[in-house]
């Protein structure tokens, strides 16, 4: 276990606004940003997404947190073995923003799992490009939120999703959001992430993959 470090960061919920901080490698047509979320559009979006290394190299917000979690990310052996059993190919599409603390505390662990699992491939896009899918896969309290992680099959059909936070954290944090006391309680949220070290995120994500393999669309907490 690495040392517990809690960064003093501004309180925020990861509900993206109009501005985006993660460019696509090529400019997406306007039709893509506003199209109905169908498989053809997902194929285009995924193809234009960034690899994990390209995204990570360009992170310019909360970078210290991204770096810490990438450096220390480990996948428990039991979860790695279960992911190996899922097979593939599966495409993992992450809709995210570098400034989102939930993304910085979860995506490095998902990326670590993908890197070590044959049959999985990862691409990342920003919230502007992924807006239709954010709207279609809202958080339990009704927000279009980042990160939104979609598991796609070979035909780019959605076979599972993971939205914003582990369910165990939502049980604490969503009431905080409802009360509007994020600034006062964000330290507890960051401490939860630091203590958990990605385990709950990975456990839930593996359940999503296992659901995809069995034909069940799993979206924890929804």
What is each of the regions a protein language model found here?
Residues 93-98, 110, 118-134:
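Thiol-based oxidoreductase modules, predominantly thioredoxin-like and allied folds used
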Residues 1-7:
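Sec-dependent signal peptide recognition
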Residues 154-158:
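Short, glycine-anchored, charge-dense loop/turn motifs used at functional sites
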Residues 9-90, 111-119, 136-145, 159-222:
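Non-globular targeting/processing and membrane-anchoring segments
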Residues 97-105:
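Conserved redox-active cysteine motifs that mediate thiol-disulfide chemistry
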């Amino acid at each position: 276990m690495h040392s517990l470090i809690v960064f003093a960061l501004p309180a925020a919920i990861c509900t993206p606004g109009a501005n985006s901080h993660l460019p696509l490698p090529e400019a997406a047509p306007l039709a893509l940003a506003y199209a109905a979320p169908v498989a053809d559009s997902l194929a285009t979006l995924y193809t234009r997404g960034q690899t994990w290394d390209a995204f990570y190299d360009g992170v310019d917000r909360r970078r210290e947190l991204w770096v810490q979690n990438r450096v220390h990310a480990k996948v428990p052996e039991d979860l790695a073995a279960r992911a190996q059993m899922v097979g593939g190919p599966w495409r993992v599409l992450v809709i995210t923003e570098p400034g989102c603390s939930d993304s910085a505390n979860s995506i490095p662990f998902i990326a670590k799992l993908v890197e070590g699992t044959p049959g999985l491939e990862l691409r990342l896009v920003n919230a502007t490009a992924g807006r239709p899918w954010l709207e279609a896969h809202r958080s339990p309290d009704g927000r279009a939120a980042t990160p939104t992680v979609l598991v796609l099959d070979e035909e780019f059909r959605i076979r599972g999703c993971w939205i914003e936070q582990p369910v165990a954290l939502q049980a604490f944090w969503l009431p905080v959001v409802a009360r509007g006391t994020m600034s006062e309680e964000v330290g507890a949220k960051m401490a939860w992430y630091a203590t958990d070290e990605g385990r709950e995120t990975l456990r839930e994500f593996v359940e999503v993959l296992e659901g995809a393999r069995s034909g069940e669309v799993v979206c924890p907490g929804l």
